[in-house]
């Protein structure tokens, strides 16, 4: 504290000089300051400092100061204070800053932290050598000591705001336990660099334009405890730079006067309210949504989007700060709640890295929390996970993200996920739409599966392949049209409404041209809106789509390149590869013979690459008529119904997992068996390697009606011709 008082004295002397025209001189070298300090101590220990311009006064004890601060440190403080700087230079620095008209003061201190341990819950003081298996339950419904969790977050001490970094000349150097973030946009000569720091007490984010003089163009956003913000040098004070504050936190912006308008694109008071009135979980999800919106607009790497990314990075760091601050303010924190918050922050960093590949983070570890989570998920069986309420399933999946070391997710969890997805899929086939709740769970499953290593158990691998096939079945032409419509309005999206089962599907044909063909034909969507929706959905699909080809064993049986594959259909005993060229060593069905304008082949391959007991030469697809809902048993189980358009190719796939799905396949809401569209065809991909075309009575009736219409037109033409002939003759 004595050091801070010393800094304040130096800083305020500069303020007095600027505002009151003081001409007094202070010592200008380290030797002089040390000698002057000695003389002060010999004369009197306490120095009284009075600031005439605002009536502030305080005492500085030099003896205590020198007991705490060494001579080299005192020299550094003196040099950093730039006390000998020409006052005209200091005045120029001040005049280069933008100052808000006033500080908006908001009553109260915002939200209450949500992860307090209920009085009825047990708490555990985890220390070195703690036996984690002694922790109860499997859902983290107990408290652990907060300081240990906080120590994992802030495990590294950093030297910040060094004097040789011009963009930080507004701050005094300091050492602090912190987490560091950075993003680089553009090249090293003319690009933009963004740096961020999160400590237990504050957040600082800096925007540095490399193409200009850093001291004049660096911009800073700060959030935190007002009395603990980094010390400023004398040409400005926090009271002048604070945009909004409440009883607990303050939001400060240090912006250049010549460019502040490009950075003040949003209302900072509203941003402050969003930060302080939302729970950390709600606020984190808001930032996730914003990053998805930036990704959808393809603005992640655009240098002109740097002001937006500056603000997003600031909000992202504040989300991390709010979680850490909540932990810091309590002796114990509830495990399940903190795991949920950590999982959301992890996903936030992940999508930020997808959007901005140069995004880096150093710190914010979860060693203790990961050990606790690992113990909890080890007790969750597959059937238990499948039977838990939705909120508890989300808790388990959050703990998996923290507790699965090196991506090694327990087999019981993977099997449980397969069961959860099958239940969700069966429910989906009653309505053929997905709500936000289902999409939220899918997002959690996506995070776990895309981070996990392939399971060693072949049985679990096969179940996961069936799971991916169920996600593929929910990626219908209806779903594609819905997502294009949503992404046509990226600013109205939320993170869950933006998630699609297509991200976990086995379709590889969803390029922009294909998506445009599936766009809704509605007057509500203009051509511009369709283009925006197609581009946005394609961007996110490219970023989040599961890299699933390496999970399909049968792919190794052929030398086909990935760009030729349209979709894969892994059934229990055979894998179908739908592609634009025929595969070797497979039973090949050429779909192009059935009216399709572009080539499409369906190749049947066994997972172990062995042959079939029937001819593997190119085969014609037989036709079955009059298929309808089976009255008994499940003849369609473990097979797939595929629909395709004559012009646009593959539309939808439907994996029949049980009798209920089989029955729901024929509902009016089903995307299959359209009575009114003769351009849509349906194939039945069976588990024995045979493919059959399905044509129902609806097709025969339509053909008969068409024949009657053509016959009537022809007959009418003949009558008219005879009438004209007789008119001429008679």
UniProtKB/Swiss-Prot annotation:
One of the record's GO cellular component terms: viral envelope
Subcellular location as annotated: Virion membrane; Host cell membrane; Host endosome membrane
Membrane topology: Single-pass type I membrane protein
Gene Ontology biological process terms, A to Z: fusion of virus membrane with host plasma membrane; symbiont entry into host cell
First-listed, main subcellular location of the protein, grouped into a coarse class: virion
Residues exposed to the Intravirion side: 728-730
Pfam families: Herpes_glycoH_C, Herpes_glycop_H
This protein's UniProt keywords: Fusion of virus membrane with host cell membrane, Fusion of virus membrane with host membrane, Glycoprotein, Host cell membrane, Host endosome, Host membrane, Membrane, Sialic acid, Signal, Transmembrane, Transmembrane helix, Viral envelope protein, Viral penetration into host cytoplasm, Virion, Virus entry into host cell
Chain ranges passing through the membrane: 707-727
Regions of this protein lying in the Virion surface compartment: 22-706
Mod. after translation: N-glycosylated, O-glycosylated, and sialylated.
Residue ranges of the region described as Interaction with gL: 190-254
Superkingdom: Viruses
Glycan attachment residues as annotated in the record: 46, 54, 101, 125, 131, 188, 209, 215, 267, 274, 365, 556, 613, 626, 688
Signal found in the keyword field: yes
Record InterPro entries: Herpes_gH, Herpes_glycoH_C, Herpes_glycoH_C_sf
Oligomeric and partner information: Interacts with glycoprotein L (gL); this interaction is necessary for the correct processing and cell surface expression of gH. The heterodimer gH/gL seems to interact with gB trimers during fusion. When in complex with gL, interacts with host EPHA2; this interaction triggers EPHA2 phosphorylation and endocytosis allowing KSHV entry.
Function noted in UniProt: The heterodimer glycoprotein H-glycoprotein L is required for the fusion of viral and plasma membranes leading to virus entry into the host cell. Following initial binding to host receptor, membrane fusion is mediated by the fusion machinery composed of gB and the heterodimer gH/gL. May also be involved in the fusion between the virion envelope and the outer nuclear membrane during virion morphogenesis. Targets host EPHA2 to promote KSHV entry.
Similarity comment: Belongs to the herpesviridae glycoprotein H family.
Protein name: Envelope glycoprotein H
Organism for this UniProt entry: Human herpesvirus 8 type P (isolate GK18) (HHV-8)
Gene that produces this protein: gH
């Amino acid at each position: 504290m004595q050091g801070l008082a010393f800094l304040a004295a130096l800083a305020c002397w500069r303020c007095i000089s600027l505002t009151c025209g003081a001409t007094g001189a202070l010592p200008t070298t380290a030797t002089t300051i040390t000698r002057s300090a000695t003389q002060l101590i010999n004369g009197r220990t306490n120095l009284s400092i009075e600031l005439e311009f605002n009536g502030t006064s305080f005492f500085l004890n030099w003896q205590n100061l020198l007991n705490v601060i060494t001579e080299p440190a005192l020299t550094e403080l003196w040099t950093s204070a730039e006390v000998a700087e020409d006052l005209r230079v200091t005045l120029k620095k001040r005049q280069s800053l933008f100052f808000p008209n006033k500080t908006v003061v908001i009553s109260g201190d915002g939200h209450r932290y949500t992860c307090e341990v209920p009085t009825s819950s047990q708490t555990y003081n985890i220390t070195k050598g703690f036996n984690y298996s002694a922790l109860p339950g499997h859902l983290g419904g107990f408290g652990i000591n907060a300081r240990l969790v906080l120590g994992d977050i802030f495990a590294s001490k950093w030297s910040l705001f060094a004097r040789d970094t011009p963009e930080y000349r507004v701050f005094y150097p300091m050492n602090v336990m912190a987490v560091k973030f950075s993003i680089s946009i553009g090249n090293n000569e003319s690009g933009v660099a963004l740096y961020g720091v999160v400590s237990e007490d504050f957040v600082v984010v800096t925007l540095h334009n490399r193409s200009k003089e850093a001291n004049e163009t660096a911009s800073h956003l700060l959030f935190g405890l007002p009395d603990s913000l980094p010390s400023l040098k004398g040409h400005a004070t926090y009271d002048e730079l604070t945009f909004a504050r409440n009883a607990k936190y303050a939001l400060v912006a240090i912006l250049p006067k010549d460019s502040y308008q490009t950075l003040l694109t949003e209302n900072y008071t509203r941003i402050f309210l969003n930060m302080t009135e939302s729970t950390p979980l709600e606020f984190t999800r808001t930032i996730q949504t914003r990053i998805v919106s930036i990704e959808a607009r393809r603005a992640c790497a655009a240098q002109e989007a740097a002001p937006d990314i500056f603000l997003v990075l600031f909000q992202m760091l504040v989300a991390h700060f709010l979680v850490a601050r909540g932990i810091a303010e309590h002796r114990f924190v509830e495990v399940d709640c903190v795991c949920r918050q950590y999982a959301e922050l992890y996903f936030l960093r992940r999508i930020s890295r997808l959007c901005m590949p140069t995004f880096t983070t150093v710190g914010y570890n979860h060693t203790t929390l990961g050990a606790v989570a690992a113990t909890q998920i080890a007790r969750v069986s597959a059937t238990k996970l499948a039977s838990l309420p939705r909120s508890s399933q989300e808790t388990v999946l959050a703990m998996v993200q923290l507790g699965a070391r090196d991506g090694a997710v327990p087999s019981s969890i993977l099997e449980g996920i397969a069961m959860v997805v099958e239940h969700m899929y069966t429910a989906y086939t009653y309505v053929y739409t997905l709500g936000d709740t289902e999409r939220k769970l899918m997002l959690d499953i996506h995070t776990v599966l895309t981070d996990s290593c392939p399971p060693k158990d072949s049985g679990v691998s096969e179940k996961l392949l069936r799971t991916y096939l169920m996600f593929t079945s929910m990626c219908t032409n209806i779903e594609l049209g819905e997502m294009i419509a949503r992404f046509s309005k990226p600013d109205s999206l939320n993170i869950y409404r933006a998630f699609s089962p297509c991200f976990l599907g086995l379709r590889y044909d969803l390029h922009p041209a294909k998506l445009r063909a599936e766009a809704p034909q509605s007057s509500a969507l203009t051509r511009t809106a369709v283009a925006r929706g197609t581009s946005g959905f394609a961007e996110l699909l490219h970023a989040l789509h599961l890299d699933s080809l390496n999970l399909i064993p049968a792919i190794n049986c052929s030398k086909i390149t990935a760009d030729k594959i349209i979709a894969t259909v892994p059934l229990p005993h055979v894998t179908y590869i739908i592609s634009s060229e025929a595969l070797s060593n497979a039973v090949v069905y050429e779909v192009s013979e059935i009216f399709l304008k572009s080539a499409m082949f369906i190749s049947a391959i066994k997972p172990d690459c062995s042959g079939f007991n029937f001819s593997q030469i190119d085969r014609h697809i037989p036709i079955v008529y009059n298929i309808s809902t089976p009255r008994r048993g499940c003849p369609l189980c473990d097979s797939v119904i595929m629909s395709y358009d004559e012009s646009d190719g593959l539309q939808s796939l439907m994996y029949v997992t049980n009798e209920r799905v089989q029955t729901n396949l024929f509902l009016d809401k089903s995307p299959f068996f359209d009575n009114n569209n003769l351009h849509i065809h349906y194939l039945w991909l069976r588990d024995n390697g045979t493919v059959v075309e399905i044509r129902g009575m609806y097709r025969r009736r339509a053909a008969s009606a068409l024949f009657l219409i053509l016959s009537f037109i022809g007959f009418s033409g003949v009558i008219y011709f005879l009438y004209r002939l007789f008119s001429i003759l008679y």
